[in-house]
Amino acid sequence: MVLGPGIGSPVRRGSMDYMLMLINKEMPVAPPLKHGIVDVRDVAKMHVAALENDTSIGKRMIVTENTYWVKELCEMLNKHGHQAPTFTPPVFLVKFLANFDKTIKPIKPLLGVDVNFNTETARSVLGYDPVPIEQTIRDTSDFLASYEKG
């Protein structure tokens, strides 16, 4: 999931829409999902670093600050004045509901999966040093709040 401050107004799709859904309580619970989070500024820096570094040719780089459960993201948002959901229903219950709710069905295989990523290649080849998640969440929150205030 790519987060961080944007340029212009946020578009209601992808990661920003997901965060707005949490902030606006359009998602009543924190689903039992774990996401890799990367700051958009890190994505830009790593693109430039890869273009300037011949060692990166032919290599795939994973850039993610770390992985976080949705509940953890909600708790970080709440530290910035939001009231995002912090209750996570049991995996079996959400999987059962996925049989009847077409919005949940696509994520059914990911529910409760403890995903992790290895960023060692990006760190060693490109010097990847990610923006801390707390800063990314704060800056995302501030960006979305400034847009909502007009």
Residue ranges: model-predicted function:
Residues 2, 8-9, 16-38, 42:
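A conserved pocket-lining segment of Rossmann-fold NAD(P)-dependent short-chain dehydrogenase/reductase
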Residues 4, 30-33, 61-68, 78, ...:
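Glycine-rich Rossmann NAD(P)(H)-binding loop
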Residues 5-17, 50-61:
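Glycine/proline-rich active-site loop of Rossmann-fold NAD(P)-dependent oxidoreductases
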Residues 36, 87, 115:
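Residues that recognize and position ribonucleotide moieties
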Residues 38-41, 68, 131:
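Residue-level signal for the nucleotide or nucleotide-sugar donor/cofactor binding architecture
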Residues 42, 72, 121:
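Ca2+-coordinating acidic residues in Ca2+-binding motifs
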Residues 46-105, 133, 137-150:
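Mid/C-terminal beta-alpha module of Rossmann-like enzyme folds, strongest
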Residues 97-129:
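Conserved C-terminal active-site "lid" loop/helix of NAD(P)H-dependent oxidoreductases
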